[in-house]
């Protein structure tokens, strides 16, 4: 048997689900989209298509549906005079929004399994020598871990609002965490990497002393420290980078099939099937036997035994490497 490589979302059926979604999706595009660089990872490719520029949502939709269907879709946090220029200097940077990234898997220890998609055996290496195929990895994302990520987002919002006077927006990343974004103009947009690093370190609590004896309701870090909040777990590199790509709100995450969605009320957020746009049922063929939590549900799969399951779950399982969606059932 020759070497077998499985690209996430390789299936034509999964592509049709994504294409149908983008035909009518109302993407959350910035008002100044003509100043933003757009980028995407198409189906069946490990590389990104970058340096794209669009002047309207209709032009973008036509490109996505008819030319390059995205597995992952982004625009730049930066504004540029020439966003389609291939040389970063030629783009002429005009400022950037302020970004924070919270990955729940950096907060929790998650169960992960590496296995061969042909024989179904658990394998620690990146290749199954018996079947001469690359192994796949599945990482179980639990609702409890997402809740912990949401709590980090809540603490971050408090710091940005109370200590900086900013108005952040929180987005579910579509997979395993949250993005917090501040739309920046004027001086905020022109913050350089060193200044953004200072903000990142501040929200992470770097160098913030303890305040024993202070009340839990005291303002700022005094109250936070006495409530047991020592800092927010963020990926500091995301905040520092003034030319970072952002997942487009209401786009689909190619590793889950879930929507990148603004969370307007943190108390109401739930990690469940409502985050998927897909309806109906699919026939799903598992690669391995496993019991696992999927979008706050416990799912039992038996290797090689097809099951009829909600499309939201089936597509999620497919993109998480646990098997293949074989058919769509209304």
From Swiss-Prot:
<dbReference type="GO" id="GO:0003899">
    <property type="term" value="F:DNA-directed RNA polymerase activity"/>
</dbReference>
<comment type="similarity">
    <text>Belongs to the eukaryotic-type primase small subunit family.</text>
</comment>
<feature type="binding site">
    <location>
        <position position="131"/>
    </location>
    <ligand>
        <name>Zn(2+)</name>
    </ligand>
</feature>
<keyword id="KW-0804">Transcription</keyword>
<feature type="binding site">
    <location>
        <position position="119"/>
    </location>
    <ligand>
        <name>Zn(2+)</name>
    </ligand>
</feature>
<dbReference type="GO" id="GO:0046872">
    <property type="term" value="F:metal ion binding"/>
</dbReference>
<dbReference type="InterPro" id="IPR014052">
    <property type="entry name" value="DNA_primase_ssu_euk/arc"/>
</dbReference>
<dbReference type="GO" id="GO:1990077">
    <property type="term" value="C:primosome complex"/>
</dbReference>
<dbReference type="Pfam" id="PF01896">
    <property type="entry name" value="DNA_primase_S"/>
</dbReference>
<feature type="binding site">
    <location>
        <position position="116"/>
    </location>
    <ligand>
        <name>Zn(2+)</name>
    </ligand>
</feature>
<protein>
    <recommendedName>
        <fullName>DNA primase small subunit PriS</fullName>
        <ecNumber>2.7.7.-</ecNumber>
    </recommendedName>
</protein>
<dbReference type="InterPro" id="IPR023639">
    <property type="entry name" value="DNA_primase_ssu_PriS"/>
</dbReference>
<dbReference type="GO" id="GO:0006269">
    <property type="term" value="P:DNA replication, synthesis of primer"/>
</dbReference>
<keyword id="KW-0639">Primosome</keyword>
<keyword id="KW-0240">DNA-directed RNA polymerase</keyword>
<keyword id="KW-0460">Magnesium</keyword>
<keyword id="KW-0235">DNA replication</keyword>
<feature type="active site">
    <location>
        <position position="101"/>
    </location>
</feature>
<keyword id="KW-0808">Transferase</keyword>
<keyword id="KW-0479">Metal-binding</keyword>
<feature type="active site">
    <location>
        <position position="103"/>
    </location>
</feature>
<feature type="binding site">
    <location>
        <position position="128"/>
    </location>
    <ligand>
        <name>Zn(2+)</name>
    </ligand>
</feature>
<keyword id="KW-0862">Zinc</keyword>
<dbReference type="Pfam" id="PF20873">
    <property type="entry name" value="PriS_C"/>
</dbReference>
<keyword id="KW-0464">Manganese</keyword>
<dbReference type="InterPro" id="IPR002755">
    <property type="entry name" value="DNA_primase_S"/>
</dbReference>
<keyword id="KW-0548">Nucleotidyltransferase</keyword>
<comment type="function">
    <text>Catalytic subunit of DNA primase, an RNA polymerase that catalyzes the synthesis of short RNA molecules used as primers for DNA polymerase during DNA replication. The small subunit contains the primase catalytic core and has DNA synthesis activity on its own. Binding to the large subunit stabilizes and modulates the activity, increasing the rate of DNA synthesis while decreasing the length of the DNA fragments, and conferring RNA synthesis capability. The DNA polymerase activity may enable DNA primase to also catalyze primer extension after primer synthesis. May also play a role in DNA repair.</text>
</comment>
<comment type="subunit">
    <text>Heterodimer of a small subunit (PriS) and a large subunit (PriL).</text>
</comment>
<dbReference type="GO" id="GO:0000428">
    <property type="term" value="C:DNA-directed RNA polymerase complex"/>
</dbReference>
<feature type="active site">
    <location>
        <position position="235"/>
    </location>
</feature>
